[in-house]
Amino acid sequence: MNWHLPLFLLASVTLPSICSHFNPLSLEELGSNTGIQVFNQIVKSRPHDNIVISPHGIASVLGMLQLGADGRTKKQLAMVMRYGVNGVGKILKKINKAIVSKKNKDIVTVANAVFVKNASEIEVPFVTRNKDVFQCEVRNVNFEDPASACDSINAWVKNETRDMIDNLLSPDLIDGVLTRLVLVNAVYFKGLWKSRFQPENTKKRTFVAADGKSYQVPMLAQLSVFRCGSTSAPNDLWYNFIELPYHGESISMLIALPTESSTPLSAIIPHISTKTIDSWMSIMVPKRVQVILPKFTAVAQTDLKEPLKVLGITDMFDSSKANFAKITTGSENLHVSHILQKAKIEVSEDGTKASAATTAILIARSSPPWFIVDRPFLFFIRHNPTGAVLFMGQINKP
C-alpha cells in the first residue's frame, strides 16, 4: 500500500556573526539558490501576485527529505540541490547554528519537526541525522483523527512563528488512513532597522501596481547613507538595488527593481541567483539617498509540488516511483502528497532609535539622489555571513 507523506513548510518574518565565513556560492548559497529557482517557477504562473517564500526553509525540508530517500529519488534531490546532505552534514550544522546565533542580535528562529503516527516505526538513523544536522524533533500525533492532528500541528506552527502564522493545515489535507508522517519547517525573523524610519515621515504616496493601476499606499521615508548600486541583466535591461541593514548588521534586506518604470519586474527575475546577489554586495557603494519604501504586509501560501517537478524532482511525488526506504522500518511505500509553504512578511517603521548622526543627515541642505520604490519590486532577507536567503518575494501591490 502507498502511504501519503504530506510536507508543510512555513515561514514568518517581522521586519521593522559568526567568525568564520563561507566561500562565494557556499553550501548554504546552493541551498538558497534552489529556493530562488522555485520562486522563478512560481512567478511564471502568478506574475501579478504578491509572492513570499523562504528559500532557506525550502532547502531545509529538501535536505531532511534527502536523508530519508534512496535510489533515484535521492539522486533527483541531490542533483537539484547540487549536494548530498550526508557528505556535508557537519558544514550544514555549522550554517544552521550560525543563522540562529545570538550574535546576529536580530531574532532568527528555525524550527523543524516530524509529526508521525508512531515514532517507533521511524528508522533511528533518519531521526538521529535530522536531529543532528537540522535540529529536528519527532512528535507523535493521531492522524486517524485529522482535525485533532491539524490542531496539534497548527499549534506548534503558531508557537514557533510567534503567532504570525496559523491555520497552515486543514483537515482535508490529512488522510486518516494513509497519512503516516508530516514534516514541518518554520522560519521566523524579527529585525530592527539599523536606521529607523520615523513614523512622522510616513505619508500616502502613489504606487503603480503590476496591473498598471495607481494606488495610494503608506510609504516609509528617510534620508540616510545606504549601500546601493545598479547593473544590467543579460538582456541589457538595467535595474537598481539597495541594502537596508538591520541593527545587528549580519542580516540585511535587499530591494531590487527595474531602472525604467516601463520595464516589467518579470524581465529581471530570471537573472536573479545567489551569485547575482553576491555581485550586488561587491559593487554597491555607500550613498546618501532619500529612500521611499512601501509599508506593507504580505502573506502567501504556495504549493511547491509543480515548481519542484519542473526542476527535476519528480519521483518523490509519484506513489509508484518514490523511494523513502530510509524513513520507516516497515515495508510501507511512502510518497509526498503535498509540499506547502506559507510565509508572511511585515515591513514597518520599527527599529532602533535613529542616531544623532542620522538626525543630522536628515536635515542636511544639499539635495540627495532618491531611491523610490513606487512600483513592483523584489526583496530578499539575507544572512550575510553565510549567504543564506531567509526570505524573498515580489510585491506587486502593497
From Swiss-Prot:
The record marks 365-366 as: Reactive bond. One of its GO terms (molecular function) is serine-type endopeptidase inhibitor activity. It is found in: Secreted, Extracellular space. One of its GO terms (biological process) is negative regulation of proteolysis. Residues 1-19 form the signal peptide. The keyword Mitochondrion does not apply. Keywords: Developmental protein, Differentiation, Glycoprotein, Heparin-binding, Neurogenesis, Protease inhibitor, Secreted, Serine protease inhibitor, Signal. The keyword Methyltransferase does not apply. Its main location: secreted. Glycans are attached at residues 118, 159. It holds the Pfam family Serpin. GO terms for cellular component: collagen-containing extracellular matrix; cytosol; extracellular region; extracellular space; extracellular vesicle; neuromuscular junction; platelet alpha granule. SMART domains: SERPIN. Serine protease inhibitor with activity toward thrombin, trypsin, and urokinase. Promotes neurite extension by inhibiting thrombin. Binds heparin. Belongs to the serpin family. This is Glia-derived nexin. It comes from Homo sapiens. The gene is SERPINE2.
